[in-house]
């Protein structure tokens, strides 16, 4: 029984020995490869040899785009491949070892950096191990968080799209020493930024529309000298404007609509109109400051939303001016201003008909007040006679004789009384009339004074009503003008964003889409 259990005790020992043998093979291979190896020398067997370096960029997260600093922050993986003849081995000599993991600081690496960084960080975030195959090819996949410069065009903000790029090049090697190229898979060149759907995190503000990649040669290098190659990865991103529509544009439109509604207040309520309009003006100024903190401080272009807010400010200021002008016109009187015939014709006849406003023609106050009584009968309910109609329609001073004849008749009567009684008149009657003549003349003069005051008051009231009606018509004209300006301006400004679309192809004139066939 004991003899049968010995093989079972030997199995763990055998496994440990085999593992130690495997580790020894990897350690021996690493020692052999690193013997006499200089990581600072370019892996070229001859001076004229060019080392091919393949690049591939995998995007895992588009973190943010800071418009004020014009900086794009991305989380990427940089895949680099090259061949080093000093790292070759025969797998049969090392127990069938096909992959060797080596610290990246122990081998030569191409000094490829992000040229257009904005924070001074040119290198990757983590120097992870490299994978070396028996033929000497090295595979390196370091992660990095880059902050690259991205010129921001704010012309159509927040309905804009931006063209950002990540430019990689060798810091010291020229094209005669290193040949940068895009990686290939299945015989196809990867001319795009690779995105793994399972590892990629969608950005809440930006949507990626195009992600091509291109090889460029430094045009600034002299013709007799070797230039530097650049691998440029482009990101054409479009902003998702829902946040700005809900938090800025919609409140501005609603607040400006309140400024339009002040025209429904009476024409004489100019103080209340100005108060509402100025409050709207202050609210729009706050929104303008919020937008100014978001966009970059540049004078090359004015953001679309800033144009709209400025337009709303102008409309609101015009509304305040209209309210002041209408109030000034409505409070005019015949004592301060005389109405021209053209003004009366345009604002009291033509415009009310065009605007379908019910403006009743003005009539004298006494006659206008008497019409209801003529229609409804006397206060006692009896029918009105012709004499009562005259008494109701005319002033009391006109019942005796007309205004222009009154003074002449009184003067003629006094002259006859002074000459003496005529035939058929008794001296007593003439004497009593002569004694009462001064009182009658005083009564007539009092009636004349009352008639003149009544006429002046009627003229004054009629003039006030005319100016008030002119103010009403002017207020209605300003309302229609401001409403048309507000609607047309809002539609015109935001229709400009409709034509600002991301191009269907990343490069004008190039029919290629720079995307894998599956996309």
From Swiss-Prot:
Annotated disulfide bonds: 150-164
Membrane disposition: Multi-pass membrane protein
Record's keyword terms, sorted: Cell membrane, Disulfide bond, Glycoprotein, Ion channel, Ion transport, Ligand-gated ion channel, Membrane, Postsynaptic cell membrane, Receptor, Signal, Synapse, Transmembrane, Transmembrane helix, Transport
Extracellular side: 23-240
Gene Ontology terms: biological process: acetylcholine receptor signaling pathway; chemical synaptic transmission; membrane depolarization; monoatomic ion transmembrane transport
Subcellular location(s) per record: Postsynaptic cell membrane; Cell membrane
Family: Belongs to the ligand-gated ion channel (TC 1.A.9) family. Acetylcholine receptor (TC 1.A.9.1) subfamily. Gamma/CHRNG sub-subfamily.
Name this polypeptide is given: Acetylcholine receptor subunit gamma
Organism: Bos taurus
């Amino acid at each position: 029984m004991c003899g049968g259990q010995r093989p079972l005790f030997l199995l763990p020992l055998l496994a440990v020995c085999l593992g130690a043998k495997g580790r020894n093979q990897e350690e021996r291979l690493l020692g052999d490869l690193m013997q006499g190896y200089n990581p600072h020398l370019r892996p070229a067997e001859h001076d004229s040899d060019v080392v091919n370096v393949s690049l591939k960029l995998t995007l895992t997260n588009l973190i943010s785009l800071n418009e004020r600093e014009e900086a794009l922050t991305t989380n990427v993986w940089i895949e680099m491949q090259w061949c080093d003849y000093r790292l070759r081995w025969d797998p049969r000599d090392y127990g069938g070892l096909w992959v060797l993991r080596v610290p990246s600081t122990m081998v030569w690496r191409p000094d490829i950096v992000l040229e257009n960084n904005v924070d001074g960080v040119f290198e990757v975030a983590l120097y992870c191990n490299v994978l070396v195959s028996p033929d000497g090819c090295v595979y390196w996949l370091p992660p990095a968080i880059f902050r690259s410069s991205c010129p921001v065009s704010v012309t159509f903000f927040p309905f804009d799209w931006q063209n950002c790029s990540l430019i990689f090049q060798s810091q010291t090697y020229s094209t005669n020493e290193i040949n940068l190229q895009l990686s290939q898979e299945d015989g196809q060149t990867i001319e795009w930024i690779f995105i793994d759907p399972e590892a990629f995190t969608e950005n809440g503000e930006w949507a990626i529309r195009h992600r091509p990649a291109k090889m460029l040669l430094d045009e600034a290098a002299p013709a007799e000298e070797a230039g530097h190659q650049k691998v440029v990865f482009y990101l054409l991103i479009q902003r998702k404007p829902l946040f700005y529509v809900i938090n800025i544009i919609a409140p501005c439109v609603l607040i400006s609509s309140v400024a339009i509604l002040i025209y429904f207040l009476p024409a004489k309520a100019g103080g209340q109109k100005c108060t509402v309009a100025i409050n709207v003006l202050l609210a729009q100024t706050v929104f303008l400051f919020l937008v100014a903190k978001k966009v970059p401080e540049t004078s090359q272009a004015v953001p679309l939303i800033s144009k709209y807010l400025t337009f709303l400010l102008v409309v609101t200021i015009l509304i305040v001016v209209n309210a002041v002008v209408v109030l000034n016109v409505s409070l005019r009187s015949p004592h301060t201003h005389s109405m021209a015939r053209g003004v009366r014709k345009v604002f009291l006849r033509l415009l009310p008909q065009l605007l379908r406003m019910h403006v009743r023609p003005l009539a004298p106050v006494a006659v206008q007040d008497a019409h209801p009584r003529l229609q409804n009968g006397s206060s006692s309910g009896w029918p009105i006679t012709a004499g009562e109609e005259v008494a109701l329609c005319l002033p009391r001073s006109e019942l005796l004789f007309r205004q222009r004849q009154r003074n002449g008749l009184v003067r003629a009567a006094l002259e006859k009384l002074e000459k003496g009684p005529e035939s058929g008149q008794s001296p007593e009657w003439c004497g009593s009339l002569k004694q009462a003549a001064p009182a009658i003349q005083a009564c007539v003069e009092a009636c004349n004074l009352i008639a003149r005051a009544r006429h002046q008051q009627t003229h004054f009231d009629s003039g006030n009503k005319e100016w008030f009606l002119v103010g009403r018509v002017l207020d209605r004209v300003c309302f229609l003008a401001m409403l048309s300006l507000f609607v047309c301006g809002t539609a015109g400004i935001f229709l400009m964003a409709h034509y600002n679309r991301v191009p269907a192809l990343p490069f004008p004139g190039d029919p290629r889409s720079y995307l894998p066939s599956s996309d």
